[in-house]
């Protein structure tokens, strides 16, 4: 990327010029003390009260950008006319009718125009509101310290003077003057265009003002990402008074591309429009050659165009997708991008993290082992969730008699970044860190971190696989270096081990071998292994290397139980042709143990488990062969995850990938569906993802895939309904015109049919409940078109039935040779009833209404009920009779029409029964 251009396409020079007036330009040249003094805050405890924060918010406003004013409802309503030229033609037809003295026709057409535009306006308004609701589902959050208490708040509530914390993967919530930085580096590429993370410190910036954005090394900008380390900062600018706010107006107009499905609907609409215009043109020409009134033919032609051209398809698709996404959100799955809904139904491989997704992400220490204990059978064992008052007496005795065990617990305590949240009433932080604090209660020990000062830290990373802290009691005593990490990484750093009496002895190769054996045994039981080491002495600040001469303290086995719904979810996914692959940083033995517990399909006699070290050396061909059988990938790195996803995609698979850390972001973005964790996920993972699980539960993915498949089926169902109705309406007028008959439907009736076709019945098909058997069918091919030959065939079949039945009624009603209002009313009502029964048949492409249940879709019942009531009103209400040129029908007439129009549903039910019976017979014959 060009270093002189930001990722949004804003020239860096212009970004700098606009940002010179922001508060960070002044505060970056002040010391921490000067900044805190000016903002009347504390660098360790933040603002003193919420009342003070509220007062500052009244002065500075919320920490958010001003939104553009929405167009008024009146403006949106009248935009319907400019967006649909056919409506303008209808207005012209109404005007011509009025000036020629046909006032009834003019009034009728005008009312129809108002009804059509109102329906379109309501649909579009509903779509926009649904999408607005989606955008509000993932509010940005900030980690705030106020009055010394840590809490998570909405970033929009921050004010200047607030103290915020940030660590790897977090997005900076406001412009901050950094007051603490531990190996802190921040990715500012989305602001400055520089892709290399910037190392941050707390020192004031020197130089002649104005100081450029890239030179403010003590400032963390809103919207930038923490790539390494952690820190705290005082908020100095919020909302429009941030560097991002200065250029917000230049990047706020971002057009949202249409989803592939919406694009295909647009193309389908254009194709159908061309066909419809062709048919309508032929109808009008034939009518004029037959000597019919040109105004009548023009009005009918335009009305047919309005009814036959499915201009409402893209809107209904959007509404259906949006409502489906909102339903997913109630099931704890937040879809950030609408195209993801379409892709969900095609997913056939899920690459899932183990921790927190397949398991509960609540670690408990179950095993403590030190070198002097010898075999694993002598290790201290604990029951998850057990407090120290109920601990095994042997465990308490072991602590009293073993300094090495006490030292191991101490290292786990000091090398720890979890914190107690007073408001929530529990510890927050990394699951492993929380377990290492909770285990202290088992032995009646206290958290001693408040009595010691941390003077150095090397944060854990997936590449290092270890973490280090250096702490001191604050006096002249020698600092203590505490290290924890993977056993195979920590053991080589150690030169000594701690004996039972607290003395140290050389840590030789035999002991290293013993540690490896014990770790392997613990891994086979499904435990995560953490090794601990320590050393008395100073650690050089800024160093990234592990110190020499460490003392090995011991091993702990942590257990993270599987989530209860995961085995069922895996079975359901496997049945539906979706393969589940576990990707974890744990050892192969631990991963295999968990995989068996959750019921992963592990193929006997094949290489089901592959370690990251082997993966790194595999060629593409070897990887392709490996992916055919491997179900578990252990000890993986972020690069390994990328390689796995690319490998599956190379095979033609549609891949969903779960992740929560900043190192998962590349794989999340590469996958066809990136799924981030809502509770434990970092901001960068959430931003890279297409979907967020608010409960971090793997079973939620099953619900999302089911919903995705169901939504696509529903879209096909209402397309079937709309197209078959359009084809029938065109065919009826075309056949009548060719046969030299008067048109059976007048313009008002045609427009009424259009309202029913694009209105409630069609939309209610979009919210049909998901078929329980949807996971018994394989995933939909990625490039499968919406319009399949079977769908077109069904549309034609339904249209032919409606055409034949409606024309039969029309012809039989005019046996006297005169066409009156009763004849057209019977024909019109017959077509509308056909419409309702056709909608009933379209509720499922394969199942009978008796299987899915008459009352399972209440929205459908309400929609059809309202449509039928509307039709009866058109037939029986005097005012509407004059508008639609109808007359009252007898009960006998209505019953006969119901009997005739139900044929489209009855024949569809018979076809479904026949196909199902044939499928059953074919299976029976194949197994007999």
UniProtKB/Swiss-Prot annotation:
UniProt-listed Enzyme Commission number(s): 7.2.2.10
InterPro entries for this protein: ATPase_P-typ_cation-transptr_C, ATPase_P-typ_cation-transptr_N, ATPase_P-typ_cyto_dom_N, ATPase_P-typ_P_site, ATPase_P-typ_TM_dom_sf, ATPase_P-typ_transduc_dom_A_sf, HAD-like_sf, HAD_sf
Subcellular location: Golgi apparatus membrane
Membrane topology qualifier: Multi-pass membrane protein
GO CC list: endoplasmic reticulum; endoplasmic reticulum membrane; Golgi membrane; nuclear envelope; plasma membrane
Catalytic-site annotation from UniProt: 353 (4-aspartylphosphate intermediate)
Catalytic activity: Ca(2+)(in) + ATP + H2O = Ca(2+)(out) + ADP + phosphate + H(+)
One GO molecular-function entry: P-type manganese transporter activity
Ranges annotated as spanning the membrane: 81-101, 105-125, 271-291, 306-326, 718-738, 750-770, 799-819, 860-880, 887-907
GO biological process: calcium ion transmembrane transport; intracellular calcium ion homeostasis; intracellular manganese ion homeostasis; macroautophagy; manganese ion transport
Sorted UniProt keywords: ATP-binding, Calcium, Calcium transport, Golgi apparatus, Ion transport, Magnesium, Membrane, Nucleotide-binding, Phosphoprotein, Translocase, Transmembrane, Transmembrane helix, Transport
Gene3D superfamilies linked: Calcium-transporting ATPase, cytoplasmic domain N, Calcium-transporting ATPase, cytoplasmic transduction domain A, Calcium-transporting ATPase, transmembrane domain, HAD superfamily/HAD-like
Residue segments, region Disordered: 1-25
Family: Belongs to the cation transport ATPase (P-type) (TC 3.A.3) family.
NCBIfam families reported for this sequence: ATPase-IIA2_Ca, ATPase_P-type
Function description: This magnesium-dependent enzyme catalyzes the hydrolysis of ATP coupled with the transport of calcium. Has a role in the secretory pathway.
Name assigned to this protein: Calcium-transporting ATPase 1
Lineage: Eukaryota, Fungi, Dikarya, Ascomycota, Saccharomycotina
């Amino acid at each position: 990327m060009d270093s002189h251009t930001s990722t949004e396409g804003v020239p860096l020079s212009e970004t700098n010029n606009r940002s010179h007036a922001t508060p960070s330009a002044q505060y970056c040249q002040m010391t921490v003390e000067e900044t805190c003094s000016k903002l009347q805050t504390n660098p360790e405890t933040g603002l003193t009260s919420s009342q003070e924060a509220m007062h500052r918010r009244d002065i500075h406003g919320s920490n958010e950008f001003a939104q553009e004013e929405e167009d008024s409802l009146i403006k949106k309503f009248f935009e319907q006319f400019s967006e649909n030229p056919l409506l303008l033609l209808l207005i012209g037809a109404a005007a011509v009718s009025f000036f020629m003295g046909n006032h009834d026709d003019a009034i009728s057409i005008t009312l129809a125009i108002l009804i059509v535009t109102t329906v379109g306006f309501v649909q579009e308004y509903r779509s926009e509101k649904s999408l607005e609701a989606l955008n509000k589902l993932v509010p940005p959050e900030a980690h705030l310290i106020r009055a010394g208490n840590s809490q998570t708040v909405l970033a929009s509530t921050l004010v200047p003077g607030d103290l915020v914390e940030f660590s790897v993967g977090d997005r900076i919530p406001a412009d901050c003057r950094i007051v603490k930085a531990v190996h802190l580096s921040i990715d500012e590429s989305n602001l400055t265009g520089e892709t290399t993370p910037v190392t941050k410190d707390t020192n004031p910036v020197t130089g002649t003002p104005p100081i450029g954005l890239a030179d403010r090394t003590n400032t963390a900008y809103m919207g930038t990402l923490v790539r390494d380390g952690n820190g705290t900062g005082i908020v100095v600018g919020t909302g429009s008074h941030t560097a991002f706010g200065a250029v917000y107006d230049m990047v706020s107009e971002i057009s949202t591309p249409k989803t592939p499905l919406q694009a295909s609907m647009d193309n389908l609409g254009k194709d159908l429009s061309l066909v419809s215009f062709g048919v309508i043109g032929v109808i009008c020409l034939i009518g004029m050659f037959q000597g019919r009134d040109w105004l009548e033919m023009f009005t009918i032609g335009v009305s047919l165009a309005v009814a036959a051209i499915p201009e409402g398809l893209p809107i209904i698709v959007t509404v259906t997708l949006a409502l489906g996404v909102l339903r997913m959100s109630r099931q704890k799955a937040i879809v950030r991008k609408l195209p993801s809904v379409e892709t969900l139904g095609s997913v056939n491989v899920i690459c899932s993290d183990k921790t927190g997704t397949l398991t509960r992400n609540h670690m408990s220490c179950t095993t403590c082992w030190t070198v002097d204990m010898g075999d694993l059978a002598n290790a201290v064992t604990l029951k998850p969730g057990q407090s120290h008052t109920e601990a095994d007496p042997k465990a308490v005795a072991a602590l009293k008699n073993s300094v090495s065990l006490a030292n191991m617990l101490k290292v786990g305590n000091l090398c720890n970044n979890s914190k107690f949240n007073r408001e929530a009433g529990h510890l927050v932080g990394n699951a492993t860190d929380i377990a290492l604090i909770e285990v202290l209660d088992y032995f009646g020990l206290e958290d001693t971190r408040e009595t010691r000062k941390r003077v150095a830290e090397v944060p854990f990373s997936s590449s290092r696989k270890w973490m280090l802290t250096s702490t001191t009691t604050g006096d002249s005593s020698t600092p203590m270096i505490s290290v924890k990490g993977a056993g195979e990484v920590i053991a080589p750093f150690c030169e000594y081990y701690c004996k039972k009496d607290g003395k140290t002895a050389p840590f030789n190769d035999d002991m290293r071998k013993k540690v490896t054996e014990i770790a392997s045994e613990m891994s086979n039981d499904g435990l995560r292994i953490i090794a601990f080491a320590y050393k008395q002495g100073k650690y050089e600040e800024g160093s990234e290397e592990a110190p020499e001469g460490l003392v090995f303290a011991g091993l702990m086995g942590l257990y993270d139980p599987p989530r209860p719904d995961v085995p069922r979810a895996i079975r359901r996914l496997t049945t539906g042709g979706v393969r589940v692959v576990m990707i974890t940083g744990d050892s192969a033995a631990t991963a295999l143990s968990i995989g068996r517990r959750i019921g992963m399909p592990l193929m006997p006699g094949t290489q089901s488990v592959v370690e990251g070290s082997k993966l790194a050396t595999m060629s593409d061909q070897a990887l392709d062969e490996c992916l055919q059988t491997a179900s578990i990938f252990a000890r993986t790195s972020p690069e390994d995850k990328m390689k796995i996803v690319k490998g599956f995609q190379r095979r033609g698979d549609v891949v969903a990938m779960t992740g929560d850390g900043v190192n998962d972001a590349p794989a999340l973005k590469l996958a066809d569906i990136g799924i981030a964790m809502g509770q434990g996920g970092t901001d960068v993972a959430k931003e890279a993802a297409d979907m967020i699980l608010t409960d971090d539960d793997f079973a939620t993915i099953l619900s999302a895939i089911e919903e995705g498949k169901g939504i696509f089926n529903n879209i096909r169902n209402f397309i079937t309904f709309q197209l078959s109705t359009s084809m029938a309406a065109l065919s009826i007028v075309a056949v009548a015109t060719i046969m030299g008959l008067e048109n059976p439907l007048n313009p008002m009736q045609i427009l009424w049919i259009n309202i029913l076709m694009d209105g409630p019945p069609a939309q209610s098909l979009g919210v049909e409940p998901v078929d329980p058997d949807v996971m018994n069918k394989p995933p939909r091919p990625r490039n499968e078109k919406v319009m399949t030959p079977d769908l077109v065939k069904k549309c034609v079949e339904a249209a032919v039935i409606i055409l034949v039945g409606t024309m039969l009624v029309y012809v039989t009603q005019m046996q006297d040779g005169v066409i009156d209002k009763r004849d057209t009313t019977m024909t019109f009502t017959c077509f509308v009833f056909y419409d309702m029964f056709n909608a009933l048949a379209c509720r499922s492409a394969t199942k009978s209404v008796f299987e899915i249940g008459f009352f399972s879709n209440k929205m459908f019942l309400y929609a059809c009920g309202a449509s039928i009531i509307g039709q009866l009103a058109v037939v029986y209400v005097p005012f509407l009779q004059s508008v639609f040129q109808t007359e009252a029908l007898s009960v006998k007439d209505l019953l006969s029409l119901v009997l005739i129009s139900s044929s489209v549903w009855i024949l569809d039910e018979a076809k479904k029964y026949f196909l199902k019976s044939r499928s059953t017979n074919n299976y029976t014959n194949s197994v007999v």
